[in-house]
């Protein structure tokens, strides 16, 4: 059962669902809009070896970031010209990780799904790849996987980037996501790189 606007207000007001900060203007007919935070991660690897920790740069923006397609030519001159013309803090090409401003806590009988905004789809910008699912019992901020597929796109801190759709399960989970022993991203309060290498460590323990 998907929660409607009335349900979302009810769950938030009764503290069954926590969204912090919460803005009543961001409640849609059956979704809640979330906004872009200031922290990002850009991987440094030429090849992703998923059995190893992935080296990366973590950085913050004050106002805006330009995201370019992977094959978009950038050199120092172009970067400086872009910064001067568009007044952006940072310019990157290829994919990067971001995070929402919103911290979310779900009970064991509510799960959620993140979807990018249709307006972003119309400029060929994707803000999640395969990681839109949020298990019941999750506590933390939502990670964004950001890729521009056509032309460079300028994103602004605090702008709405997507929405959460909440669903109520038939019965509560015995153990919610953040209480599971092997949950890798429980309680995340800033952008986090992939911890998939821990899957192999877990498999070796079993």
From Swiss-Prot:
Residues forming the catalytic site: 145
Pathway membership: Pyrimidine metabolism; dUMP biosynthesis; dUMP from dCTP: step 1/1
Entry's Gene Ontology molecular function annotations: dCTP deaminase (dUMP-forming) activity; dCTP deaminase activity; nucleotide binding
Subunit structure: Homotrimer.
Keyword Lipid biosynthesis: no
Site (Important for bifunctional activity): 132-133
Organism of origin: Methanococcus maripaludis (strain C7 / ATCC BAA-1331)
EC number: 3.5.4.30
Coiled coil spans: none
NCBIfam families: dCTP_deam (TIGR02274)
Function: Bifunctional enzyme that catalyzes both the deamination of dCTP to dUTP and the hydrolysis of dUTP to dUMP without releasing the toxic dUTP intermediate.
Protein family membership: Belongs to the dCTP deaminase family.
Transmembrane segments: none
Name of the protein in question: dCTP deaminase, dUMP-forming
PANTHER family registered for this protein in UniProt: DCTP DEAMINASE
Catalytic activity line of the entry: dCTP + 2 H2O = dUMP + NH4(+) + diphosphate
Superkingdom of this protein's organism: Archaea
InterPro entries referenced in this protein's UniProt entry, alphabetically: dCTP_deaminase, dUTPase-like_sf, dUTPase_trimeric
Keywords of this entry: Hydrolase, Nucleotide metabolism, Nucleotide-binding
Binding locations of dCTP: 117-122, 135, 143-145, 163, 177, 184, 188
Single GO BP term: dUMP biosynthetic process
């Amino acid at each position: 059962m998907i929660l409607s606007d009335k349900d979302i207000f009810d769950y938030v007001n009764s503290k069954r669902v926590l969204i912090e900060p919460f803005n009543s203007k961001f409640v849609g007919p059956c979704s809640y809009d979330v906004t872009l935070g200031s922290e990002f991660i850009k991987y440094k690897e030429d090849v992703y070896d998923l059995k190893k920790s992935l080296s990366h740069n973590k950085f913050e923006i004050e106002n805006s970031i330009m995201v370019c397609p992977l094959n978009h030519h950038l050199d120092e001159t172009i970067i400086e010209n872009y910064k001067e013309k568009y007044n952006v803090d940072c310019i990157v090409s290829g994919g990067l990780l971001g995070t929402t401003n919103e911290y979310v806590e779900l009970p064991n009988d509510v799960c959620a799904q993140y979807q990018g905004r249709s307006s972003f789809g119309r400029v060929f910008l994707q803000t999640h790849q395969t990681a839109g699912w949020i298990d019941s019992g999750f506590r933390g901020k939502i990670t964004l996987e950001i890729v521009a597929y056509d032309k460079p796109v300028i994103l602004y801190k605090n702008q709405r980037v997507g929405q959460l759709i909440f669903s109520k399960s038939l019965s509560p989970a015995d153990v919610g996501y953040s209480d599971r022993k092997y949950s890798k991203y429980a309680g995340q309060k800033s952008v986090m790189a992939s911890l998939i290498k821990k899957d192999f460590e877990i498999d070796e323990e079993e």
